[in-house]
């Protein structure tokens, strides 16, 4: 926790942070990891601090069967290239292979346009997504809504929904 303040939740994110620290400025690193760091809320601080110093240039969500020889039908994999330089306007390439069947050979799916989906998005656009999740597939309208619209919590106080006032009278337990 002391050394890896934002990545101590997971050995994977500590590894990413350590590898990035070894890269010279404007240098590149490339890794194949599990993809949980891209979306889960507990990795938000890790994403924020990492993307403040670096830019994802390419990312491929491989999904299941990342390593067929390991029978990896449980862990979802992602391969990415990161540049140790903040470039907000850089248009990164993202490839999603997650839609292919779990048992499919990802090297074949990579060249098959039926399951493969390609996206281009800048680091600026990703900064507008709450939690800095790497949601490269978000449409321009969704990104615009996050950028320009107010959050619900900024407009009203959110709390529990409708309450009965007298649970014993109005709620039946079966």
Regions found by a protein language model. Name each.
Residues 1-174:
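Signature of N6-adenine DNA methyltransferases within the class I
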